[in-house]
Amino acid sequence: MQVPFASHDCPLRVAPHAQDVRNLAALQSLPEVLAERKLESIRNSWSIMEEREPFPTRRAWQDLSCLLLFGVATCGILLTSCLCPSKPPTANSHQGSEVLQPYLLFAVASAGAVGSLAAAFVCTLLARKAPKCVAWAALFSRPALTTLLAFVFVFGAASQGRAAPGVAGVLLAAFGIWQLVVTCREQTRSVSFTAKLTEVTSDVIKCRPCFYSAVAVGVFLGFLWTTICMLALARAFVEVHEVTKCILVSSVILLFAWGSLVVTNLCHMVHCGIFGLWYHGKDCPRTMLSSLRVAATTSLGSVCFGSLLVWFLQGLAVVAQCVQRIGHKQSKGLAFISSTVLGRFIVCMDDASDCFNDWALIQCAVRGTSFLESAAATYSVIACANVQYIMEDLLLSSLALLSGIVCSLAGGFVAASTGWALGGASAALVGGSIGVMIGMIAGAAALGGVSSGIMTVLVCWAEDPLPLIESHPDVHLELESKILGRLRGNPALQQHP
C-alpha cells in the first residue's frame, strides 16, 4: 500500500542537512519503507559531494574494470576479424569485395565525416543565433523522422514493385500524423522554456568558443570508430569463412553499438566539463583539452560502464515486456507471474534507466566520482531542488534527435555521392549507410552538446543557485516559478497521510 507522505508547505529547495520524507516532493508518493531507503541514499550522497569539491586537481581512475572489459572486447573482436582464416574465393565474391575495398570505405567515411561536421557546425550556430527556432524545429523532429521513414518505405515499394513496404510506409505516415497531433497538443508549452535555457548555453558558447573544437573532436571520434568497425565488418563479410562469419558479424555489430554509445557519452562528458567550469567560475586556459583529458582518461571507465549499463537495462526491460505479453496469452498462472513479478521488474528497470543515464555523467565530469556514486549524487541533487519538474518540460532528447537527423542526412548524402562517383550504386548504398552512422554520432556532439550544457547548468544550479542568479537572474526566477507551480498543482502534496 502506498502512503502519500504529504505536506502543504513542501519547500522549493531543501538544505543538505534538513532532508526529510515530508519535505521532499520526489518521495511523497512512495511507500514508507522505500521512501526512507531513498532518503538515506540522498543523505549519503550529499556527504560524498561535500567531501569532494568540484573539479579537483587530482582525480582517481574510476570503474577501471569496465574500461579493461571494453579494451579487451575491442582488441579481441577486431583482431579476430583480421586474423580469421580466409574462405576460398568464388565467382560471386568478386563484386562484393570490390564494393567493400578498404580504400573505398575510408573514402566514403571521410566524405561522410566532412558532411556531418559541416552540418554539426550549422546546427550549433543556429542554436546560438536563433534558439527559439531551433526549439520549434526540435519539437517536430520525431514526427519528421517518422514521416521520413514512411517516404523511404513507400519509395522502396514503388521501385521494387512490392506491396508490403508500401503498407508499412502508409502505417508509418499515419503514426507520424498522430505524433504530430499529440506534439501540438501537449508539448508546445515546452518550446519557450527550452529556448530560454538554450540562450544560457548560447551565452556560454560565446565566451567559451572551445565548444566548437569539442564538436569537431566528437565528429572525428565518430569517424574513427565507424571506420574501424566497418573495415572489420567488411572483411568478415567478404573473406572470413562461413562457419565463423555469423558469430563474428554479430560481435562486431554489438561492439559498434557499445562503442558508439561510449563515443557519444564521452562527447557528453567533454561538454559537461566545459559548462561546469564556466558555472563554477574555474579559470582554465585550455578548457576543452582539460575536459577531454578527464573524459578520456580517469573517467573513461565510467563512460564505458554507464553506456553498457543503460544498454543492458533497456534490453532487459524489452525482454521482460515480451515475456509479460506471452504470459498473458498462455495461462492464468503465467499471467499472474507476468503481472506481478515481471511488472515490478519492468518498473525497476525504468527507474534504473532514469537514474543511470546522461545526467549521472555530469558528476563524473565535475567531481570525478564513479558512475554509481555519480548516479546517486545526481538523484539526490535533483530531488532536493525538485529539478524533476523542470526536466519534464524540456525538449533535450528532441534537440539531440534534430541534430542527429540533420547530420545524418548531410553525412549520408555526401558519403553516398562519393560512393556513387567511385563505385556506382552499390558503393553509394554502402557509403550512405556509413555516412548516416557517422552523422548520428556527430549530431550527439552538436545540439547534443547544447543539451549537455542545459543539463549541466540545471544540476549545478540545483546544488548552488548563486552563480546563475548573478549571471542570468531572469532564468533563475523562471526555474523557481515553474517548480513552485508544479508543487502547488501536485495532488500528492494536497493530501494528509
Short names for language-model regions:
Residues 3-497:
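Eukaryotic membrane transport/trafficking proteins
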